[in-house]
Every structure is written in C-alpha cells, then in structure tokens.
Amino acid sequence: MHLRRVRTMPRHSQSLTMAPYSSVSLVEQLEDRILCHEKTTAALVEHAFRIKDDIVSSLQKMQNKGGGDRLARLFLEEHIRNITAIVKQLNRDIEVLQEQIRARDNISYGTNSALKTLEMRQLSGLGDLRGRVARCDASIARLSAEHKTTYEGLQHLNKEQQAAKLILETKIKDAEGQISQLLNRVDLSISEQSTKLKMSHRDSNHQLQLLDTKFKGTVEELSNQILSARSWLQQEQERIEKELLQKIDHLSLIVKENSGASERDMEKKLTQMSARLDKIEESQRRNAEGQRKPEEEKVHGRISKLELQMTEDMKEMKAEVNAGFTAIYESIGSLRQVLEAKMKLDRDQLQKQIQQMQKPESSM
C-alpha cells in the first residue's frame, strides 16, 4: 500500500510571493520527514504482506505435503511478531506524524497569520505609497511650475545683470577717464609747482648774488673812501709840516737879521713861537682826529646799516621762499587729499555696485 501526500501551498502564500524564510524552510523540512515516514511505512507494509504471502504459500505447501503444523505455527508466530512490531512502529510513526502535523499546522497558522499581517501591512503600505505618489505628483507639478517661474526669473535676472554689467563697465570707464584727467592735472600742477620752485630758487639766488655784489661794491667804496681820507690826512700833515718848516726858516732868518736884539726878546719870541707851534700842532692834530673820527663813524654806520639791510633782505627772502614752499606743499597736500577722497568715493561706489550685482547672483 502506497501512501502519497501532495505538497500544497496555502492561499496566502499563493497570493503573496513574500513570506518569512525561516517558517517556509521549517514546513518544507516537516513535509520531507512525513514523506520519508510514509515511504518507510509503505516499505514495512509491503514487507509484511510479502511475508504473509510467503507464509500462506508455505502453509499451503505444508498442508499439501502434510506434517507441517509445527512449522506453520512458527511461521505464524514470526508473522504475528513482525506484524505487531510493524503495528507498533506504525503507531509510533503515526504519533510522531500527528505531532509533526500539529506542529506544521501551528506553523502554518503562524505563517498564515504572519502572511495576513504582512498582506495587511502591504495593503496599507500600498495605500500609503499611492498617497505618497499622488503627493509626489502634486509636488512635482508644483516644483515644475516653480522651476518654470524661477527659470524665467533667472533669465530676467541674467538680462538685468548683463545690463548692470554694461552700465558698470561704462561707469568704470568714466571713472578711469576722470582719474586719468585728475592724474594729468596733478602732474601738470606738480610740474608747474616744480617750475615755480625752480624760478623762485633762481630768483633768490639772483637776488643773493645782487646783494653780494652790492655789498662788495659798498665795501670797496668804503675802503676807497677810507684810503682817500687817509691820503688827504697825509697830504694835510705834509702841507702843515712844510708851512711850519717855512715859518721856522723865516724866523731863523729874522733871528739872523736881528742878531743885535737882546737875548731876552729872542728867548721870549722863541718861546712864544714854540708855544704857537705847539698850539698849531695840537689844533691840527685835533682837527685831523676830529675829521678822522666822524669819517670812521660814518663809515662804520654805513657798514652797519648795509649789514642790517642785507640781513633784513635775507630774512625777507627766506620768509618769502619758506612761504612759497609752504604754499606749494599745502596746495600739493590739498590736491592729494582731494584726489584720495575722490578715489575713495569712486571705489566705494564701485564696491556698492559690485555688491548690488552679486546679491541677485547669490539669490539665484
């Protein structure tokens, strides 16, 4: 007797392709063991029937031959033992199979419940996925609309950026032209100031040379006047000495002519003459010293006046040169400050325009 079991899958496993791997493998193992037990029981039953057939045939032969009771009894006992053993084995196998069937039913119930829960989860997941897909479609449509608007805005911003770039380039060119003009003006002013400085330096040098020549001329004139005064004094002294010598000679002649006069009168006259000569010499010396002192004082006064005038002229020229230098430095400093302020303003304007252009780019 052959027993045959067909392996069937549950409905949920047929409807759903996914199941827990551990439960499926355990069910398959149980089914394999049941098939193996069925095969063994079928083999034992076949073996018992074969023994039965052998016994029946042997009994028939013994009955035909006669005197086979004892042997038949032995065969029957052997057959009964075999059958009881087979029945016991079958009972044990049936119990094992029942337990395995109960375990398989429990496992199949668990797998069915798990599959049902999985199916419910999958259905809920599918509904959730459908809702998500619908929401994704709506968000995709919204994003496509936003993308379109942003693309149009980007194109508009690109056009504005190009226009602003052109305006900024023109402004930069204008600023560069203004800066170049200012630099040219500064160069011209610096060259003019340098030429003025050179001219003032030349004029100051020329005036100093003129003052030097004037001072030298006055010194030479004073020295000539001093020399002329000294020569006049020497001439006057020589003239007075000649007059005195002439008078002395005249007196000596008179003395020789009047040798007959008394010695007292001669002595008196000589003393008077010597006194007169002394007085004349003192007066002449006083007159010469008096004339020399005012002339020397005049010369010293003129020299001091010339020195004071020259020092005052030098101070005035130095003050004028310093004033010119300070005015030039002040004008250069003011020009530099104006240029730096203008360049700073232009730089700030350019930086503001660049930042204004960079803001839409960063937002883009």
UniProtKB/Swiss-Prot annotation:
Keywords, in A-Z order: Coiled coil, Cytoplasm, Synapse
Basic and acidic residues bias spans: 275-300
Native source species: Rattus norvegicus
Highest rank taxon of the organism: Eukaryota
Tissue: Highly expressed in brain (at protein level).
Region feature (Disordered): 275-301
Coiled coil feature spans: 80-107
Listed name of the protein: Protein FAM81A
A GO CC term assigned to this protein in UniProt: glutamatergic synapse
Complex formation: Interacts with DLG4/PSD-95, GRIN2B/GLUN2B and SYNGAP1; the interactions facilitate condensate formation.
UniProt family annotation: Belongs to the FAM81 family.
Gene Ontology MF terms: molecular condensate scaffold activity
Main function: Facilitates the interaction and assembly of proteins within the postsynaptic density by promoting the condensation of postsynaptic proteins via liquid-liquid phase separation. Required for neuronal activity. Accumulation at the postsynaptic density results in enlargement of dendritic spines.
Localization terms from the record: Postsynaptic density; Cytoplasm
